[in-house]
Amino acid sequence: VATMVAGCGGSSDTTSADNSNSGVAATATESGSDAAETDTTGDEGKVFNIYCWNEEFKSRLTDHYPGYEEVDATTGKIGDVTVKWNITPSDDNAYQNNLDATLLKQESAAADDKIDLFLVEADYALKYVDTDYTMPIADLGITDADLANQYQYTKDIVTDSNGVLKGVSWQGCPGVLFYNRDAAKEVLGTDDPDEVQKYVSDWDTFNDTAETMKAAGYKMTSSVNDTYRVYSNNVTSKWVEDGKINIDDNIMKWVSDSKELYDAGETETYELWGDDWKKGFYPEGKVFCYFGPAWFVNFSMAADTEGSIGYNGGWGATPGPQGFYWGGTWICGATGTDNASLVKDIILKMTTDETIMKDIVVKDDDFVNNKPAMEAMAADTSYQSKVLGGQNPLSMYCASVEKLDLSNLSAYDQGCNEEF
């Protein structure tokens, strides 16, 4: 795991790219081929170790998994099994470094110290699923029929190079454009989602609207970085081809469009998550729009802070210039777990139980990985997002998720995207 590729680091050296790939293959070979032979029967352990980078999955399990009891901030109980949460933030790659070091010791670790379940993100999922440290989902006794209602892209992201599914997610993360309703009414004369979409339907139209927004005193986006995910999700080639770094035409279009907007004073160059970038979450920030999936509304837009646009239900949602996805969390069973039955049950309940899925949508405003649940909620007129002024955005999420193309996903995405 220590030599697994975490990205291309901006290097265009052919040897470097080739060596990174061989490192993945070497690690998989060295770890053995026991994953396919893992015994999920017999006596199970009394300590269940979960590795993750934030509180999101912990809150989902606490709130929605039947029988989960919270003991303290890092401990829970499921029946007579003690659940231990090992939460390491992702800053400076700390989570992956900690996970890698622990997985290297997995085979020789004491039963109560073995990782049972760990989480991965889309940008680096292949780093883990292309090794034997992740269990094939089928080896847990989970069938294709069990997962039939899940969105295909969520399976593609955690399918290894041999076509074996190695992880499952409870959520989907299709993205949309969130716009400031007051700014839309003031500048465009309407805050109706269908009407606003006409002003952001493609990048040329989006850029024209940016000029109109500037004239009215608004930035189109808080930063050029707000649009990067949308462009990078719509590439027609991979970051590394034939052992060489490749910059897709759509990435270069982001560069040229962003420079044009910045030079015209229609956006800024703030880093995502920084204080300056967040100013647009408030009316005085004078920002027209942001891009994001369902989790962005809950975790990133200061919706719980009095005086923010979200607190007052002042955002609206519309599809925007192109469909995209951003983030998502996948559950992986760790090879060597002595709690395979519990791993299986958590995956099945948290990612396939339609009642639990709907409960997550209602209570957490999440977009869940269950087609029937999402289609039912999208048609439910009683479901409204407070942050979005009572709008039900689920139908546009449903439409967006079906169009996602992950054919150009690669193990180099995290590093190359971050360096670029």
Predicted regions and their residues:
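Conserved N-terminal structural module of periplasmic/extracytoplasmic solute-binding proteins
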Residues: 2-126, 144
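A local structural motif
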Residues: 46, 73-91, 110-112, 190-197, ...
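Structural recognition of the beta-strand scaffold that forms the well-ordered cores
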Residues: 49-52, 85-86, 116-120, 167-170, ...
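Extracytoplasmic/periplasmic substrate-binding proteins
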Residues: 58-59, 66, 253-345
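Short helix-initiation/N-cap motifs at beta->coil->alpha
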Residues: 87-104, 201-205, 269-283
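Hinge/lid segment of periplasmic solute-binding proteins
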Residues: 93-96, 107, 111, 118-176, ...
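Helix-loop-helix "hinge/cap" segment bordering the ligand-binding cleft or interdomain interface
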Residues: 138-148, 156-227, 239-272, 335-341
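C-terminal lobe and pocket-closing loops
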Residues: 299-305, 321-325, 332-419
